[in-house]
UniProtKB/Swiss-Prot annotation:
InterPro entries: DTB_synth_BioD (IPR004472), P-loop_NTPase (IPR027417). The active site is at K36. NCBIfam families: bioD. One of its GO terms (cellular component) is cytosol. GO terms for molecular function: ATP binding; dethiobiotin synthase activity; magnesium ion binding. This is ATP-dependent dethiobiotin synthetase BioD. ATP binds at G11, V12, G13, K14, T15, Y16, D48, E107, G108, A109, G110. Belongs to the dethiobiotin synthetase family. Pathway: Cofactor biosynthesis; biotin biosynthesis; biotin from 7,8-diaminononanoate: step 1/2. Substrate binds at T40. Mg(2+) binds at T15, D48, E107.
Length: 221
């Protein structure tokens, strides 16, 4: 199966959540693998792919397909560096990796609607749909997340994609909206959906509990 870690925006913690899940599944003895097909903003090495692949003891080169220098959308980078992103190659590579693992975690770049190609638009929702993947959406815990999270949910729904759930990441106990965001988001969506919360600096038990709850929800999805 493919668990696709996407997000409402960039910089909300997709890689961090991916590391938590990979470490948890590996420690459970589950054959888990990871790939981030496109990473942008790369200086010397792709930091996201490197962080997660190092947990698996694999070279980062096995965990990324396209690397771009500037911190822009994949499509903008492809124009800037004059590289044609082969989406069929990405899908083929991911499907091949899926066959070799019990769980393949795929990490997107930026949010769910970030363009990979245009005319026609190919974004991360397109990849999720094409791969029959199960999307997990990472979002900020604080002010602004209701708008971003609901729009992300609504966009996925318009593509007939139901997310496994949302992780409201970075709860810091100071900003007041964080205490109500989870249940208000649930009310806005108007159907049951998993919404988890993770502290800004979670301890090991919190990280394990999050991964365990996500893993259990997959079995019941």
């Amino acid at each position: 199966m493919i668990l696709f870690v996407s997000a409402t925006d960039t910089g909300v913690g997709k890689t961090y959540i991916s590391t938590i899940l990979v470490e948890y599944l590996k420690n459970k003895g589950i054959n888990v693998d990871y790939i981030k097909p496109i990473e942008t903003g790369v200086d010397e090495k792709p930091e996201d792919a490197y962080k997660v692949s190092s947990i698996l003891g694999k070279p980062w080169q096995e965990s990324v397909i396209y690397i771009f220098k500037k911190p822009m959308s994949p499509y903008a980078c492809s124009l800037d560096e004059e590289v044609d992103i082969d989406v069929d190659r990405i899908i083929k590579t991911i499907k091949e990796r899926e066959q070799k693992a019990s769980v393949l975690i795929v990490e997107g770049a930026g949010g769910i609607a970030v363009p990979i190609k245009v005319k026609p638009l190919i974004d991360y929702a397109y990849l999720i749909k094409s791969l029959h993947a199960l999307p997990l959406v990472v979002a900020r815990a604080y002010l602004g997340t209701l708008n971003h999270s609901f729009l992300t949910y609504f966009y996925l729904k318009s593509k007939d994609i139901k997310p496994l759930g949302f992780v409201l990441n970075g709860f810091d106990y100071e900003e007041p909206s964080q205490y109500s965001n989870a249940y208000i988001l649930q009310d806005m969506i108007e159907e049951h959906i998993n919404i988890w919360r993770l502290d800004k600096n979670p301890d090991e038990n919190q990280r394990i509990n999050l991964a365990e709850n996500i893993w259990k929800s997959i079995a019941n999805f």
